Amino acid sequence: MAANLVVNAAGLGAQRLAESINGLNPKTIPDRYLARGCYFTISGKPPFQRLIYPVPEPGGLGVHVTLDMGGGIRFGPDVEWIDRVDYEIKPERADSFYSAIRKYYPELKDGTLQPGYAGVRPKITEKGSAAGDFLIQGPEEHKIKGLVNMYGIESPGLTASLALADIVAHKLGLPEIKDGTT
């Protein structure tokens, strides 16, 4: 495939896609590490009407509370370093959730947590290392005109998507857009 502009924002597949780009120096491609995050839910009336974020833990924000659009509640995610993409939620992981959640919700009863869902975050730093920021490489870094590679873009990337788009546009030398006009 030939293109004038390519933005590699493939998330978990960003490194693999970058490896397929002709002329890209493999040394510019960071290693990929995988961190599964599981969520558990509870049934019944949610005990909270607001988000709760405990003090962050290494590798993530800790088991926090989020509310979904249907009025339900989710606890998570945790951080489990894995070797391959795997979305299985092991029920025994609930044990560590109970202790984490009881730090801010001591009334949580045993047996109330139910597996919700899991996601896999693309990390660019390995277990035990300080958390890495997003890595966004343009032509200045890898010497290929019209290419931007984005690595380690995890869930905050959704919140920061407009700012990330500005960074990508700048790296590609595109004109700035103001108030919907160029």
Language-model features: locations:
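Active-site substrate-recognition segment that forms the wall
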Residues: 1-143
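Glycine-rich phosphate/pyrophosphate-binding beta-alpha loops
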Residues: 57-60, 148-161
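Internal hydrophobic alpha-helix adjacent to the cofactor/substrate pocket in enzyme cavities
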Residues: 161-179
